[in-house]
Amino acid sequence: MRIADVLRNKGSAVATISPDTTVTELLAGMAQYNIGAMVVTGPDGLVGIVSERDVVRRLNERGADLLGQPVSEIMTSVVVTCAPGDAVDTLTGLMTENRVRHVPVIANGQLAGIVSIGDVVKTRMEELKAEQEQLQTYITQGG
């Protein structure tokens, strides 16, 4: 299975923010869309990603004053990305190796989607269910 298959199932919409968005505005957007990370974009495209984990760590370090600061202060600027043609298994390894749960998808230099570990698990569960149904059909039809 490829990343393109995951995006086909979940859609390619990506919630983005600009680097000067405040952490408070970031949190409001994450709550509104019920998501765990937002991609930070500038005029030239992807510049970073900010996750719930980034916010929690920085709040612990800097306190509530962080809420009025721009997300550029806390974003991860070296972003792990993948491509639509990449295998889901490869992405799973990448997520584990880099300890990230959200990976932007880049196609032809443009942001084409985002895949979370939850999306990967859901897709894999659907794949396993289809395999199970095929095996049950094979068994009941006498192989």
Descriptions of predicted regions:
Residues 16-34, 40-41, 81-99, 106:
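The conserved cystathionine-beta-synthase
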Residues 30-33, 38-54, 95, 103-118:
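A glycine-centered beta-loop-beta connector
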Residues 1-12, 51-80, 86-96, 117-143:
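Tandem CBS (Bateman) regulatory domains
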Residues 7, 26-27, 46, 91, ...:
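Generic leucine side-chain signal with a strong bias for well-ordered alpha-helical environments
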Residues 21-32, 63-74, 109:
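Short, charge-rich amphipathic segments
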